[in-house]
Amino acid sequence: MFVRFYKRLDRQYIQSQRRWILSSNKCLLQGNKNATISPLRRAFDDQDHWEESQAQNTSSEQDNKGKNSSYFWSRSKATAPQVAHTGLFQNPYLNSPEGLRKFANKSLTEATALVRNLREDSSQEGLVRYIIRLDQLSDILCRVIDLCEFLRAAHPDEQFVAAAQECHEQMFEIMNILNTDVVLCKRLKQVLSDENISSKLSSEEIRVGHILLEDFEKAGAYASPEVRKQFIQLSQNISIIGQDFINNTESLSSSYIKIPCKDLESSGTSHLVLRQLTKDTMGNNYKIPTSGYAPYTLLNACPSEAIRRQVWTAMFSCSEKQVKRLKSLLQLRRKLANIMGATDYVSYQLEGKMAKSPENVKNFLNTLVDHTKPLAAGELEELAKLKRNVENLSETNTLKLMRPWDRDYYSSLSPNFTRPNHRVDGFTSINTYFSLGVVMQGISDLFRDIYGISLKPVVAQAGETWAPDVRKLQVISETEGIIGLIYCDLLERPGKTTSPSHFTVCCSRQIYPEENDFSTIQVGENPDGSRFQMPVISLICNFRATRHGKNKSLCLLELSDVETLFHEMGHALHSMLGRTQLQNLSGTRCVTDFVELPSILMEHFAKDRRVLLRISSNYATGEPIPEELLSAFQEQNNFLKNTETFSQIKMSMLDQRLHSITDQDDIIAVYHGLEREMEVLVDDQTNWCGRFGHLFGYGASYYSYLMDRAIAAKIWDHLFKKDPFSRSSGEKFKEGVLKWGGSRDAWQCIADALDEPRLVKGDDWAMRFIGEVEDM
């Protein structure tokens, strides 16, 4: 209850800061004297300039201690005292692992004092402000727990990561203790039931109050002391084992496998491929690594199905220890659900969600299966024909014939489905038109067109970021000024999470007159003079930068990378525009099966030809991408599209089943049984479910991704398909969905966006309506 966080994320003190002086506000592109490069693009594409500006900013801070800090490309207002070396996110505590511990202890002291006030202040004014104070308590805890969640995933210093884990466990336990606090729960119920008090509350306060009351009850606040104690311990254990599970999802059962040289050499595999492989010391076997480039090359190039199956199985299998972690996680969750009176964790978790019940989720997924399975089978038929011909097989059932280790090999043989290897005849590589800076500028331009906001780069203070290649962006509204901050950690680096992620570091909320300590937050100002806690988020990706021409390094994106970046920026957009009075409902703090909607809608923009043509720019010439080249790549990107969607359906069903079974010892059998039941590219060879990391973060709610894909497809068709740059459509989506965060019923938001009032009920008809979508 007190902490609601999602990855999927000192006052901004009003001060005059001198602009970093550039020789020109726009700089010439390499190789094209007539083209110009925007400051935002240059921040990501000109590594030398970035390093120079970082160094100059640090030097300026050291030379001007106590004076205004040096930002470049944009001004921001502030009145904070300047220091030569701040901490992460301008929090002065966060300059060392020990500083993080001090910040956690400071927050714990503040939380303890606030809890005492909540328990003791029974005055009329105290009761009227009770929900606001509960929200402030939640904010104190969130700003430690969410921060630590981020640091564990991204900070390069192992000591910082260890401190983050320690502080996370400490504050998470406090949160669970508060979740079961009987006194706090009863007083909240009193506030909501007393009309003399509730009549003085805003609609947002009442909604937060009801949500918090439901969370109290879900945590067992009315249960016996023994049950509450069990809830606290189980929740703590789930958090710890879940983090351990996440940390090991990339660990394979073995780092390599051995294949006899005679088998591989007689398989028909190209000698060019074989020359890239190493042999064991005796020279009798090839040592095939289970990660990296080599195994994928064999899946594409080896004619032997037996060898492909062996390689594929090794690539997607985890250790027995990892399977045990998953079993423990599932057992703990089932026990927690049972002591709370639920039959299983699925039923427990779906309370309060859009889907409402396991039966509704099941019906939704079955609707998708009925629509998608025939389409997936049709896509695989072309590959099945090739397999029949190559191996002289008589099997006519495509789904029985095609296995997951066949897909890449027969795709490489098919003239109709072969993916281009970065090039189309007569053209340069497609990624040369989508440098990281070009795409970031394109996203900013799109946001400006449809939402009236844009992105501006600023140089962070020394110590404000955790790695030298992190870029800091201000989010600027046409009407409100600076509304939020995004820290972009987009380039690959050892030790950081491999999953693209949006981390909320600090939620937006209203600042109250009695608050005067802004040393650990950044504060924004509304047009009416009121102040708000600046939303701060971090975006994590692992794009690769390489040397290109005169550039020290340049990051060029494939179309799939462009979609990834648009997706994560969709989460960021939600965090920036969903600035509610109370942080409990700010931005992405909405129900789980609604949170992916803004990000998946952004994927539609990333796939739209009109958008891509507008934002593209060759990094060397400045020319837009040729439409013929873009069309060719987009056609190839639709390769096995429905088959990929069906794999998401299978994962959603697996999540539901694993969280509803009574015997967790049979999880591999459950996985294999579901694969055989679903029939499409059946995997009955691996224990891949142990590598399915979303079973922790999206436990019993992984269906949310598909549900939001279906909703996003309908919203795209209704609002943006005709004109993706429409300001009126953007305003409708912003006013109907984005600005509310979680402060409005999700079905009401969707009903308004789609102009379909019947959806407000969120009943069986609504679920079927969402599930009946032609193109996800």
UniProtKB/Swiss-Prot annotation:
* Keyword Ubl conjugation on entry: no
Q: Which SUPFAM superfamilies match?
A: Metalloproteases ('zincins'), catalytic domain
Say which domain of life the source belongs to.
Answer: Eukaryota
Cofactor binding description: Binds 1 zinc ion.
Q: Where is this region: Disordered?
A: 48-71
Give the protein's recorded name.
Answer: Mitochondrial intermediate peptidase
Please give the family membership noted in the entry. Belongs to the peptidase M3 family.
Recorded catalytic activity of this chain's protein: Release of an N-terminal octapeptide as second stage of processing of some proteins imported into the mitochondrion
Q: What is the transit peptide's residue range?
A: 1-28
List all Polar residues biased stretches.
Answer: 53-71
State which Enzyme Commission number(s) the record gives.
3.4.24.59
Q: Where does this protein hold Zn(2+)?
A: 567, 571, 574
Pfam families attached here? Peptidase_M3
For this UniProt record, give its keywords in alphabetical order, as a comma-separated list. Hydrolase, Metal-binding, Metalloprotease, Mitochondrion, Protease, Transit peptide, Zinc
Q: Which GO terms describe its biological process?
A: peptide metabolic process; protein processing involved in protein targeting to mitochondrion
* Required cofactor names: Zn(2+)
A Gene Ontology term for the protein's cellular component:
mitochondrion
Instruction: Please state where this protein is localized.
Output: Mitochondrion matrix
What PROSITE patterns does this protein map onto? ZINC_PROTEASE (PS00142)
Q: Which organism is it from?
A: Eremothecium gossypii (strain ATCC 10895 / CBS 109.51 / FGSC 9923 / NRRL Y-1056) (Yeast)
Gene field:
OCT1
**Which EC class heads this enzyme's classification?**
hydrolase
